[in-house]
Amino acid sequence: MKHITPTQFYIHPVHVDLIGCGGTGSLVLSGLVRLHLAMKSLGHPYGLEVTAWDPDRVSQSNIGRQLYVESEVGLFKTDCLINRYNMHFGLAWKAEARKFYTKAYYPAHSIIISCVDSRTSRAEINSYLPESGPYVIDAGNDDSVAQCLIGNGSEQLPYPYQVLPELIDTAVKEKNRPSCSLAESLGHQGLFMNQWTATAV
């Protein structure tokens, strides 16, 4: 299928809402920094403008699998990551330490990246989407499988949740694992599963 990127992506800042800053989201954010720098070096006038959304705080169990360090335990994930990259690369990206909520209007040069880990969260995101509009990338993984889908609600490129409605089926029972050590978590998911998913984004 041939797809043409809208002109607005080339002449305006590309607005990115990254929802979820856990195992996959924290790695996606580091990739967005590199993408921003690459776009600027290739002549894009603005690069990316990113807002990261996540109400969670860093816990001890996050260290190792996610991009956090011991001194950040107890702090909001979004604040840790956004402050780090803003300071290191002179960016002005935004941290929202809360659940994602809808905007009244999405410019044509908008991208939503969902890196959440539950059907309930995906269903909430889906409820905010207009009939067609922003590009939506859904990246998720289980113990041994992952998915990465993109869509904008058009007939040619439907939203991820139109392609795989089971992703937002809240009637399906979720796997609810308690927080555990890095060693214990490796018993049910490989160390680089999140990295693979983030790279696909």
Regions found by a protein language model. Give the residues of each.
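E1/E1-like adenylate-forming module used to activate ubiquitin-like modifiers
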Residues: 105-197
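Glycine-rich phosphate-binding loop and adjoining beta1-alpha1-beta2 segment
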Residues: 46-90
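Glycine/serine-rich phosphate-binding loop and adjoining beta1-alpha1 elements at the start
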Residues: 1-16, 189
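N-terminal Rossmann-like NAD(P) cofactor-binding subdomain of oxidoreductases
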Residues: 44-45, 53, 116, 140
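A structured beta-alpha segment of the ubiquitous adenosine-cofactor-binding alpha/beta core
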Residues: 73-109, 116-123
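Conserved beta-strand segments of alpha/beta enzyme cores
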Residues: 49, 92-94, 135
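Oxidoreductase and adenylate-handling cofactor-binding alpha/beta cores
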Residues: 199-201
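Glycine-rich adenosine-cofactor-binding loop
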Residues: 12-43, 51-59
